[in-house]
Amino acid sequence: MVVHPSPKLELAFVTIGFVLLASSPALAQQGQVLTTLENSVVTAAKGWETTVMNAARSLFWILAGIEVGIAAVWLAINAASLDSWFAELVKRIMFIGLFAFILDRGLEFAKAVVDSLYQIGAGGGSASPANIFDAGIRVATKMSEQAKFGLWEDNALAIAAVFAMVVVVVSFSLVAAIFVAVMVEMYVGLLAGMIMLGLGGSSYTKDFAVKYLVYAFSVGMKLMALVMIARIGSDILLGLAEAPTATSEQFITTLAIAGISVVVFVIAMYVPPILQGLVQGASVGGGMEAIRHGGQAASAALGAGFLTIGAANRGFAAASAARAGGASLAGAAMRGLEAGVGGAAGAVGSAAKDKAIGSPGAYAGSMLGLANAKLDQQSGRPGTPPPPPPINDKK
């Protein structure tokens, strides 16, 4: 008996091949979209610069007048001499003049600080969200050379390469999204924070104006750290993809690239805010938070690995049964692939449905854990019994 492969499975593999071939130009255009978004934010922010600056100047001179008036009242109450009046006048003129200069040049100074730190992080080169996204596309394009499906090809390596490509593109897309968010914070924060410079007209509120300059330095540090992390991560991944071990140990290198891209994303998400909080004198996060989320990502990867192993075992069993029934080698291989991929997809879909409807025993496990249990049940292996439902002590 000859077992023919499923037409749906053949169509799926053909579709995947076309998507892999056509995805590079489309994804490359996404970098231009990020650049356009950044330029749009800059243009929109500049439209508010005059309005915010006029409001800050009005607030500054109102507070400066109040400051001079209070000083004059205290001098009159204390019956100060002419020398005291002259000394107080000089002191107030120097104070108001200094903060008036900061108000007039504060935005330019803040942008200069941020740009200088930004260039330090870029290492003298160019860095932008589009460049970060393009770096992920270059790594994925390099790995697409290993995604070759066929009867005489290493299909396990091809599946791992496709999986790693998806992980790399998603991770660098998220890093680019973080970059865009920080850039928006920089433009909007520095512009809206100009109103704080208007509070420098009084000695009682001058600390707010100083905090604006501290904020500018903290945003620059955040950008510098993010650019450094993105450039170092992309260089490491490109080096791994082009290293000699990429051809001798292809499977291990492919999985390592996928794992490192996730690590780069987690570091880019948590380390820059920590540096920003360090400059501002407040801790906004810790290393344990990054470790916790990294552990969650590792648990998800481990669950996906076990699910892949279970699907492979199911496919091998189906292929062996088909071969024993008289199927050809190609037919048995396709039947095994159909059983493995179809079983894994069905298990994940069933687990997602149980999590969505809140089935008994689904509340305490992850979706991948439930999918592994369902795949074991389909294969006839005993699975772990579901935990008991939570006890409601409230009557």
Curated annotation (Swiss-Prot):
GO cellular component, as recorded: plasma membrane
Primary location recorded for the protein, binned into one broad class: membrane
Localization: Cell membrane
Biased composition (Pro residues): 383-395
Keyword Manganese listed: no
Residue span of region Disordered: 374-395
Example GO biological process: protein secretion by the type IV secretion system
UniProt keyword annotations, A-Z: Cell membrane, Conjugation, Membrane, Plasmid, Transmembrane, Transmembrane helix
Topology relative to the membrane: Multi-pass membrane protein
Spans through the membrane: 9-29, 59-79, 93-113, 162-182, 183-203, 209-229, 255-275, 302-322, 329-349
Top-level lineage group: Bacteria
Similarity field: Belongs to the TrbL/VirB6 family.
Record protein name field: Conjugal transfer protein TrbL
Organism: Rhizobium radiobacter (Agrobacterium tumefaciens)
Lineage of source species: Bacteria, Pseudomonadati, Pseudomonadota, Alphaproteobacteria, Hyphomicrobiales
